[in-house]
Amino acid sequence: MVEQDFNLLPEVLDGVSSSKAAIRYGCAKVLMDLSEKHPEKLYPHMDFFTALLDSNYRILTWNAMAIIANLAKVDEDKKFDAIFDKYFGFLNDAYMVTVANVVGNSAKIALAKPYWAQKVTNELLKVENISTTPHLTEECKRVIAEHAIKSFALFFDEIEQKEKVISFVESHVDSPRKTLGKTAEEFLLKFR
């Protein structure tokens, strides 16, 4: 509905603050979808989404991560540059889904802002060293590594330190997580 009438956008933005979960998360999902199709319409609200990174509701934080990554391609004012460290600081979060959201959205940022590709690469290579927690196990780390390889594949042409990425990927070929091993093998067939 908002896609047909962007005058409704302020109401959807307000809905993210609703005390009712269904409204709050429904509105956030609408905004996430809109950010993919019409990032230019949401870009004037970039500060709103940046503030959502600090939400008490993890789901809103995850939505904000995706939205911000989608807005990177229209970020003429370089607002993302000011929050790069904050955004990628979530790689140290105790929750696997939070870390996976950063990793999964990283390629969008690297492609939208090629001058960040090396720094994004460095951040993604750090996933090897994230700490385990009750919400981020060794198996979770393997899932995150798989997401990192998929992200690298999307912007590999922009990466200067290709050998470091290849080494990272090679270290996962024999992973006990079958899909990680397969993803690593496919990456190496394509890029090595």
Regions found by a protein language model. Give the residues of each.
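Short inter-helical turns and helix N-cap capping residues of alpha-solenoid HEAT/ARM repeat scaffolds
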Residues: 19-21, 56-58, 94-95, 141, ...
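Acidic, Ser/Thr- and Gly/Pro-rich intrinsically disordered linkers and low-complexity segments
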Residues: 129-147
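Hydrophobic, well-structured mid-protein blocks that either form specific transmembrane helices
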Residues: 57-105
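Structural signature of alpha-helical solenoid repeat scaffolds
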Residues: 32-33, 69, 107-108, 146-153, ...
